[in-house]
């Protein structure tokens, strides 16, 4: 049986650090072919203190399949974020069509993550969402909940978030707290 192809999306520098243990575990398994897509603000020097180093660090960690996806527009206002999210859907759809992953994994609540989740949903690709159910009181919270509704597998980071996911109607068999 061929290995399952997992596409892990990283759209900010901090998500590299937060996902490192997961990436290492996925990468060491023979039954998984791991692809990491770096995009969004993870590729912009203005937002990433270690600009350009995410790819280098992934390579040093032994990740073989690394893809860069440029779709973030310059600026920091609502119009730019909305346009970036739209462009991101287009770019992620192309990437997913080329890679044909069995599963896409996203983390968080940013507009770039929503782009990946939306593309995966429309392409009928299974989606895992890490950090669903968290609350922030910001616009990002609505985006997080939208991503939750697009996801098939939910990985909460605390029990309160797991309970919120269940109250949102998610299948208890697909909701986990790690």
Predicted regions and their residues:
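Structural motif
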Residues: 9, 37, 106-108, 130
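N-terminal subdomain of nucleotide-sugar transferases
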Residues: 1-43
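Active-site-proximal region of nucleotide-activated glycan assembly enzymes
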Residues: 125-178
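Conserved acidic residues
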Residues: 66, 102, 152
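Conserved nucleotide-sugar phosphate-binding/catalytic loop shared by glycosyltransferases and other
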Residues: 35-81
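Short N-terminal targeting/anchoring amphipathic segment
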Residues: 94-111
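Short Gly/Thr/Asp-enriched flexible loops that form oxyanion-binding sites at enzyme active sites
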Residues: 108-125
